[in-house]
């Protein structure tokens, strides 16, 4: 029982006393679970002031620009760790020992192959389908091939499903790309890292060996780390909502992918690149900056600012450094990249952007990196989904471990009152 209480006074001087819960970090939370029995609900469209669950996985302080995974700062993880170690931390809550990490990595590596019949499913899609449409369908279909681990009440089944999803996502993501460009699928290699294996499956062909560039490999690994989890966002909440009904893990992750596909969520880096294409040249930047400052103009700079972070996005700091490393390594000369770098310079120095805290965010830099690597913008959200899969799994598993209720939001009904029905049709 919480020590602190909150009181709500309703019409007629009826007072409801509610517990105030305290977390390890962050805001206090008023426990409103008893409100329904009192005949009232809360109204919070978008759940911006509602804690839908209790979680020990990720903490965000948007005002201070803090992002912690199991208590570890994101910048330390991105700099001193690798994606699979971060996956272990998210899934199990603690840093792995060397022995635990080696076993974890081996298990993931040995499950990267997908059932051969799944490769045939790709051919049911049009070649010009958006890769996210294909990714949604293929992920949901996994339940038809791996139905020996679908008992969500069995911890071992949940762990097996977690390994399968984490292992097979890069394979399926790369196959989405290969299918879209008409090239043969490239199978995974056990001698490569998680990020290196993905790059090899993306760019290798039967004609020549693809040598994984270590700078690009590290950049991809960092992209995966920085997108691994972000607390109760739209797609994670979707996974939890789907999971609350007892749905199988593959269906839940497919639901998360569908939510992530939205341009307001996972499509932000793709939208940022399209904005750069619209600007097209450095000489056009002043005009677009002027429009961005005009509140009556519909144009908005994509990839700047963040709904949660009122300060600098902590992920963007690492991503900016990585972006410049990649551009230096590749020596790329590209009009859009020049536009991006000039926009970055303006945003970091223009008083308007500084005052509004419209700093370049992780989507801005990740889009530039992926483009420089030769990855088309249609694949950006697929890579985001691949990275976020471990976060979705961690939340899905936590929900089952801690106990859950089926999600059933309420509504503020503003439709017709009860009325009689008399058909106007001739009978």
Swiss-Prot record:
Activity regulation as described: Allosterically inhibited by NADH.
Catalytic activity, as annotated: oxaloacetate + acetyl-CoA + H2O = citrate + CoA + H(+)
Gene behind the chain: gltA
Lineage of the organism: Bacteria, Pseudomonadati, Pseudomonadota, Gammaproteobacteria, Enterobacterales
Pathway it works in: Carbohydrate metabolism; tricarboxylic acid cycle; isocitrate from oxaloacetate: step 1/2
InterPro entries reported for this sequence: Citrate_synth-like_lrg_a-sub, Citrate_synth-like_sm_a-sub, Citrate_synthase, Citrate_synthase_AS, Citrate_synthase_bac-typ, Citrate_synthase_sf, Citrate_synthase_typ-I
Keyword annotations from UniProtKB, A to Z: Allosteric enzyme, Transferase, Tricarboxylic acid cycle
Any Gene Ontology biological process: tricarboxylic acid cycle
UniProt KW Transferase keyword: yes
Subunit structure, as described in the record: Homohexamer.
Family annotation (Pfam families): Citrate_synt
Top EC class, one word: transferase
Similarity section: Belongs to the citrate synthase family.
Gene Ontology molecular functions: citrate (Si)-synthase activity
Something else known: Citrate synthase is found in nearly all cells capable of oxidative metabolism.
GO cellular component: cytoplasm
Name by which UniProt lists this protein: Citrate synthase
Catalytic residue positions: 306, 363
PROSITE patterns cross-referenced by the UniProt entry: CITRATE_SYNTHASE (PS00480)
Organism: Salmonella typhimurium (strain LT2 / SGSC1412 / ATCC 700720)
Enzyme Commission numbers on file: 2.3.3.16
